[in-house]
């Protein structure tokens, strides 16, 4: 009887210990690791390749600050066109990260632009390129020759209103 109880407990313990391992494996494999690289913190994943960092301050029509969300990074691909409409869409996502479905974008600041800074291997110096935000947009350049993870930064004020 004692041998049978010990055998039963051993089998039961083995089942529970293996179930926790298989759950961790299946949970970690459901995350698409190809698009992100792990940062210093285990819960932080940085996009691999080019990304658009949206860091905006939401103001009303009079310039009073309404919302200052955290920055949000969106993976983008070289060769794609970033239009004003698409950028406003990303800005609204950044606003939603702080105040979900509370605000909508009215307009971007007229001086808003997207900048990327990288070390140019050919010129052997640091370069900063600026891209104006227009209806036609601009094509995201391929900077993989110079930098692996170029960050295209949008840091501006944006006029917003409650939905």
Swiss-Prot record:
Gene3D superfamilies given in the database record: 3.10.20.130
A Pfam family assignment: Staphylokinase
Naturally occurring in which organism (per UniProt): Staphylococcus aureus (strain MW2)
Protein name stated in the entry: Staphylokinase
Function of the protein: Potent plasminogen activator that converts plasminogen into plasmin. It forms a 1:1 complex with plasmin, which in turn activates other plasminogen molecules.
InterPro entries associated with the record: SAK, SAK/SK_sf
Chief subcellular location: secreted
Source superkingdom: Bacteria
Any one Gene Ontology cellular component term annotated for this protein: extracellular region
Gene (name only): sak
Keyword Secreted: yes
UniProt-annotated location(s): Secreted
SUPFAM superfamilies: Staphylokinase/streptokinase (SSF54328)
Keywords attached to this entry: Plasminogen activation, Secreted, Signal
Family classification: Belongs to the staphylokinase family.
Leader sequence segment: 1-27
């Amino acid at each position: 009887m004692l041998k049978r109880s010990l055998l039963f407990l051993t089998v039961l313990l083995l089942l529970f210990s293996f179930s926790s391992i298989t759950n961790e494996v299946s949970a970690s494999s459901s995350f698409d690791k190809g698009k992100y690289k792990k940062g210093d913190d285990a819960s932080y994943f940085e996009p691999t390749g080019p990304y658009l960092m949206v860091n905006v301050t939401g103001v009303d029509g009079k310039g009073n600050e309404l919302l200052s969300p955290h920055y949000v990074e969106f993976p983008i691909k070289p060769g794609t066109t970033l239009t004003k409409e698409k950028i406003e869409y990303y800005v609204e996502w950044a606003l939603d990260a702080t105040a979900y479905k509370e605000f909508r974008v009215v307009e971007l600041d007229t001086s808003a632009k997207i900048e990327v800074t990288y070390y140019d291997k050919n010129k052997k110096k640091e370069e900063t390129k600026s891209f104006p935000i227009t209806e036609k947009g601009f094509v995201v350049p391929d900077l993989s020759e110079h930098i692996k993870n170029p960050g295209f930064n949008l840091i501006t004020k944006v006029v917003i209103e409650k939905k």
